[in-house]
Amino acid sequence: MLDNNIIIKGNRDGLNAVINMNNFRDFDDMLESLMEKLSKGRLFYKGCTLKIITELKYINEREFRRLKDVLFDEFLIKDCIFEDSEEKVNKPFSGIYEGKTKFIRRTVRSGQVIRYPGNLVILGDVNSGSEIYAGGNVIVLGSLRGYVHAGVRGNRKAVVAAYFMQPQMLQVGDVATRAPEDNVKPQYPEIAKVRGDTIVVEPYLPNKFI
């Protein structure tokens, strides 16, 4: 019998995993099935870009974190993209400070979670173990070492900028990645944005983005 609960197929940039959440009891049931399916070709997925297409409304923030951790740690996925199968349309931001912006004048410490529907500007560091969620852009006037998700409603036009960019995990819109495990640490501000289906990090040139 053909299993249509999870379908994995190749695309031009990597692999698609089409998941029908309605066919699973809950998130744990789906995750177990996905891991079983991916385990059959574990070495094949190493270093690839995986796009997960499903009904995103059935997965909460903690479950997204668990799913991404499994894909990055267990299967060594390079990049992970989430696409809503219901194809909701989102309005993009066109500038780094467009829309509502909240300023946080302190360091965000491990265990702290900050959420804001607009842009976030943090006048301090974002420590490892902390979490930042913004509907728009995230600007860190310090070191970024925690988890950050800009454009949480699928806004791929959002950006993340920091004086020192070394996040545990970085997500813009529906595209997620991790910082490279090397010793190269640029001594200048950087900005992360989505290009195609990949997050790219470039030197931050204020006149270009503001």
UniProtKB/Swiss-Prot annotation:
Keywords: Cell cycle, Cell division, Septation
Superkingdom in the source lineage: Bacteria
GO biological process: cell morphogenesis; division septum assembly; regulation of cell septum assembly
InterPro entries recorded: CAP/MinC_C (IPR016098), MinC (IPR013033), MinC_C_sf (IPR036145), MinC_N_1 (IPR055219), Septum_form_inhib_MinC_C (IPR005526)
Cross-referenced HAMAP family: MinC
Subunit description: Interacts with MinD and FtsZ.
Function: Cell division inhibitor that blocks the formation of polar Z ring septums. Rapidly oscillates between the poles of the cell to destabilize FtsZ filaments that have formed before they mature into polar Z rings. Prevents FtsZ polymerization.
Family under the similarity heading: Belongs to the MinC family.
This protein's name: Probable septum site-determining protein MinC
Native species: Clostridium tetani (strain Massachusetts / E88)
Phylogenetic classification of the source organism: Bacteria, Bacillati, Bacillota, Clostridia, Eubacteriales
